[in-house]
Amino acid sequence: MQPTVIETWPAPAKLNLFLYITGQRQDGYHLLQTLFQFLDYGDTLTIRPRNDDQINLLTPIDGVENEQNLIIRAARLLQQHCERRNIRPAQFGANIHIEKCLPMGGGLGGGSSNAATVLVALNHLWQSGLNVDTLAELGLQLGADVPVFIRGYAAFAEGIGEQLTPANPPEKWYLVAHPSISIATPLIFGDPELTRNSPVRDLETLLNQTFVNDCEAIARKRFREVEQLLSWLLEYAPARLTGTGACVFAEFDTEFAARQVLDQAPEWLNGFVARGVNVSPLQRRLSGQR
């Protein structure tokens, strides 16, 4: 049976509604507790299968070599996995076009989301038949955040981010602002002043406390642009860093309230308004919803 032909696939952004660093493993990876929620906003990938095994990214991303791009790496990883298991679809290549909206180094999970979308979409288009657990295991080879995008549901994450428990935080509206800089994750996680000993708590406890991002103090101290953005946003609503930055977000109960603040934003602020959603737009697309 032929799959429903879907060419256009969302690669949504995520927010870390809170992020606590609880320790560090001997291999250098940080242990954390974080709450992931998706946004109804992100990149868009157009994917068309090919009858050969060529993987072509038709819209290269500035500053990223194709061979290092998570889009290409994800497609080839899926190819290799299928070949090892003697799964050889008639169409085993792809032409991929990306409409890039999410900033690099922004803490919105753009690269991880792109990788997840490629794995999910090509599994569908190639009729590979892999289940979500297998796709998530493949995704983890590409990055700790990839599995949550593959599974497609808001989640409480522990470990290095790969231990996921479904969660259902309020679906608020957010003004997400980007300071026109990129922050590489190793810069924050490698900072000697980063808090690495937050206490481990259960989700119920964390949901009833003020949400905090342990990376925020470092980002504000090291990057004046982040400090400037947060100082402005905090005049209007609760606001904090997502991931290791550089993006920050303020939360609102209505779209109107969020847009009112965006309309007052100074010229140097780059931002957008989006709704937090607990079911990923990618999951909705796969299940036939819009």
UniProtKB/Swiss-Prot annotation:
<comment type="subunit">
    <text>Homodimer.</text>
</comment>
<dbReference type="InterPro" id="IPR013750">
    <property type="entry name" value="GHMP_kinase_C_dom"/>
</dbReference>
<keyword id="KW-0808">Transferase</keyword>
<comment type="similarity">
    <text>Belongs to the GHMP kinase family. IspE subfamily.</text>
</comment>
<dbReference type="GO" id="GO:0019288">
    <property type="term" value="P:isopentenyl diphosphate biosynthetic process, methylerythritol 4-phosphate pathway"/>
</dbReference>
<feature type="active site">
    <location>
        <position position="14"/>
    </location>
</feature>
<keyword id="KW-0547">Nucleotide-binding</keyword>
<feature type="binding site">
    <location>
        <begin position="103"/>
        <end position="113"/>
    </location>
    <ligand>
        <name>ATP</name>
    </ligand>
</feature>
<dbReference type="InterPro" id="IPR014721">
    <property type="entry name" value="Ribsml_uS5_D2-typ_fold_subgr"/>
</dbReference>
<feature type="active site">
    <location>
        <position position="145"/>
    </location>
</feature>
<dbReference type="InterPro" id="IPR020568">
    <property type="entry name" value="Ribosomal_Su5_D2-typ_SF"/>
</dbReference>
<dbReference type="InterPro" id="IPR036554">
    <property type="entry name" value="GHMP_kinase_C_sf"/>
</dbReference>
<keyword id="KW-0418">Kinase</keyword>
<comment type="pathway">
    <text>Isoprenoid biosynthesis; isopentenyl diphosphate biosynthesis via DXP pathway; isopentenyl diphosphate from 1-deoxy-D-xylulose 5-phosphate: step 3/6.</text>
</comment>
<dbReference type="Pfam" id="PF08544">
    <property type="entry name" value="GHMP_kinases_C"/>
</dbReference>
<keyword id="KW-0414">Isoprene biosynthesis</keyword>
<dbReference type="InterPro" id="IPR006204">
    <property type="entry name" value="GHMP_kinase_N_dom"/>
</dbReference>
<dbReference type="GO" id="GO:0016114">
    <property type="term" value="P:terpenoid biosynthetic process"/>
</dbReference>
<protein>
    <recommendedName>
        <fullName>4-diphosphocytidyl-2-C-methyl-D-erythritol kinase</fullName>
        <ecNumber>2.7.1.148</ecNumber>
    </recommendedName>
</protein>
<comment type="function">
    <text>Catalyzes the phosphorylation of the position 2 hydroxy group of 4-diphosphocytidyl-2C-methyl-D-erythritol.</text>
</comment>
<dbReference type="GO" id="GO:0005524">
    <property type="term" value="F:ATP binding"/>
</dbReference>
<dbReference type="Pfam" id="PF00288">
    <property type="entry name" value="GHMP_kinases_N"/>
</dbReference>
<dbReference type="GO" id="GO:0050515">
    <property type="term" value="F:4-(cytidine 5'-diphospho)-2-C-methyl-D-erythritol kinase activity"/>
</dbReference>
<dbReference type="InterPro" id="IPR004424">
    <property type="entry name" value="IspE"/>
</dbReference>
<keyword id="KW-0067">ATP-binding</keyword>
